[in-house]
Every structure is written in C-alpha cells, then in structure tokens.
Amino acid sequence: MAAKIKKGDTVVVLTGRDAGRSGEVIQVMPKEDKAFVRGVNLVKKHQRQTQNQEGGIISKEAAIQLSNIAVADANGKPTRVGFRILDDGRKVRFAKTTGDQIDG
C-alpha cells in the first residue's frame, strides 16, 4: 500500500492530548504504523549525564499512531489523501477536500 503520510508533510493531530495541533513529520515507521511529529506528543525523558552531554530532564517527541493524524490541506485543515496518475505516468497524492496536489 502506498504511503499516505510521508516525512516532511504537515499534519494535524485528530485525537488525544494534542488534538488540533499541527506539525511537520520527522520520521515515519510504517511497520509499526507510527510517526514522529515535531512539537507534538512531547514527553519528559530523564537523561543520564555522559562525557559530552549534560544530564537532566529533556522534552522529546514520542511516536504517535498514524490513525490519529491527518495530512493538512492548503487551509491547514485535516484532509484525506487520494492518489492520481498524471498524464506523464507519475502517481501523486492529492487532498480530497480541496483537490490540490500534495507532492511533485
């Protein structure tokens, strides 16, 4: 199945603690059906001190389920993603709400 959410996409969180917030996808893990979104689903991590890093409590993004996020359209609203095949044979993603092309 083709990837509907890719690294670099702007997404909106649909459910959970951060519902309504948006951010850029940092990493997608398709086998686990999870993604990391910049500035969303932050957790506190207790970092041990090392030779080149100071110890303490740091904020870090945690993975979020792909079913709980949606790609944002040009208006910043969540949209479903469809696929089109262009005249030159390329397969591209498009926003179902506006019909705008997402990539390429």
Curated annotation (Swiss-Prot):
The protein's UniProt keywords, in alphabetical order, are: Ribonucleoprotein, Ribosomal protein, RNA-binding, rRNA-binding
What's a Gene Ontology MF term here?
structural constituent of ribosome
Q: Which GO terms describe its biological process?
A: translation
Keyword Membrane part of the UniProt annotation: no
Query: Sorted alphabetically, which Pfam families does this protein's record hold?
Result: KOW, ribosomal_L24
Keyword Ribosomal protein recorded: yes
Tell me where on the tree of life, at the top rank, the source sits: Bacteria
Q: Name one GO cellular component term.
A: ribosome
Q: Supply the PANTHER family for this chain.
A: MITOCHONDRIAL RIBOSOMAL PROTEIN L24 (PTHR12903)
Record's subunit section: Part of the 50S ribosomal subunit.
- What is the stated purpose of this protein? One of two assembly initiator proteins, it binds directly to the 5'-end of the 23S rRNA, where it nucleates assembly of the 50S subunit. One of the proteins that surrounds the polypeptide exit tunnel on the outside of the subunit.
Which family does the UniProt entry place this protein in? Belongs to the universal ribosomal protein uL24 family.
- The entry's protein name is Large ribosomal subunit protein uL24
Species per Swiss-Prot/TrEMBL record: Methylorubrum extorquens (strain PA1)
